[in-house]
Amino acid sequence: MNIGVLFDLDGVLIDTESLYTQFWSEINNTYPTGVDNFAYKIKGCNLERILTTYYPDTDSQKEILNALNKFEEEIQYRIFPGVIKFLSDLKNRGIPTALVTSSDIEKMRKLYNQHPSFKNYFDSIITGDMVSKSKPNPECFFKGASQIGIPTTNCYVFEDSPSGIKAGLDCGAKVIALATTLLRQDIDNSVAAIIDSFVDFDVEKMLLI
């Protein structure tokens, strides 16, 4: 079976999107960008892109980075219900997987501290500091697919954010969107499917898409 599966992290596998929305909304109140719906606009973007695009002042960057590090040390990385079962089924079937996230390696370290076995479910892990261009550029998905030896056109991509969904579509993958961050009606209708969670979704259903 020559297929692979590429997963985003926040809002797809772990329930953190609402926490990050609150964090970045508070940052935008303290360091106003003048951007409407700022916390939603930056979803899926890596930290470097956020800081260089919206906070060119180096002092502000340092203060925001310190606040983010403190925030990520304190939050609980809760894995969504059904996720481990789904990942285990893929592994048991020998279907290669990659985690493709805009998060940096330091944030991943904090996640692994809470869930030491989490990384064992993936054949490759691509973090935001491993690519030169952030989502919506599809570079990260091309890299993830290359790492598992499967063309992107033979991959499923699980995403929740507009930038991640666009990156998945632009790399030619079948995108399955999680309605965790966006309302169903706000999700790009070019996606292959929309699901609410992994609770009632399994690999057999994925393979029919």
Task: Show which residues each predicted segment covers.
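Short beta->alpha linker loops
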Residues: 19, 42-46, 81-82, 103, ...
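Asp-based, Mg2+/Mn2+-dependent phosphohydrolase catalytic module
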Residues: 1-3, 88, 104-106, 110-209
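Conserved phosphate-coupling serine/threonine residues in phosphotransfer and NTP-handling enzymes
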Residues: 12, 101-103
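Residue-level marker of regulatory loop/turn positions in helix-turn-helix DNA-binding domains and
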Residues: 79, 100, 133
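N-terminal helical cap/lid subdomain that shapes the substrate entry/recognition surface
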Residues: 2-93
